[in-house]
Design a protein with these regions (language model features):
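Serine/proline-rich low-complexity intrinsically disordered segments, especially terminal tails, linkers
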Residues: 12, 17, 104-106, 119, ...
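Leucine-rich repeat
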Residues: 65, 85-90, 106-111, 127-132, ...
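Consensus "Asn ladder" position of solenoid repeat domains
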Residues: 76, 98, 116-119, 137-140
Length: 151
């Protein structure tokens, strides 16, 4: 009986751990952003207080079934280019109040809400955002915006 319980507990723990593994594309993209210089020195990972332990342990992200579903990085002094292209389960993003200069959310079919206000965004890509309902881009450096890929 003890062996059976121990075995079941091990299987459950292992399945929970696997459930938090991030897809390679998403992990690579987030890791690249974490290594970029932050607005006030250091890098973006340091600005978020990321202490390592796997990219799925990044503060401010929610992971479900191996995919990022939500990012909440508002007012964190982040900077650089954030490429969230091809994040199929991403639904909500709040990166407001940073110094991000470029953003791509192309190929994020589940994206419902994007708040990227109060940044330095000069370019943003939206292709394939069929579910987008809330878009906040005020106080950026956009000269024009192509919303052809947005309903």
């Amino acid at each position: 009986m003890k062996r059976t319980i121990l075995f079941l507990a091990s299987v459950m723990a292992l399945s929970c751990a696997w459930g938090q593994n991030l897809s390679k594309n998403e992990a690579k993209s987030l890791e690249a952003f974490m290594n970029q210089p932050a607005a006030k020195g250091g890098n973006n990972g340091q600005a978020l207080g990321y202490a390592g332990g796997g990219i799925s342990n990044l503060p401010g992200i929610t992971v479900s079934n191996g995919h990022v579903t939500e990012i909440k990085w508002n007012n964190k002094d982040l900077a650089g280019t954030l490429d969230l292209s091809g994040f199929p389960a991403l639904q909500k993003v709040d990166i407001s109040g940073n110094k991000i200069s470029s953003l791509s959310v192309s190929g994020t079919p589940a994206l419902i809400e994007l708040n990227a206000s109060k940044n330095r965004i000069a370019s943003v890509a939206f292709e394939g955002c069929e579910q987008l309902q809330v878009l906040r881009l005020n106080r950026n450096r956009l000269a024009e915006i192509d919303l052809a890929g947005v309903p």
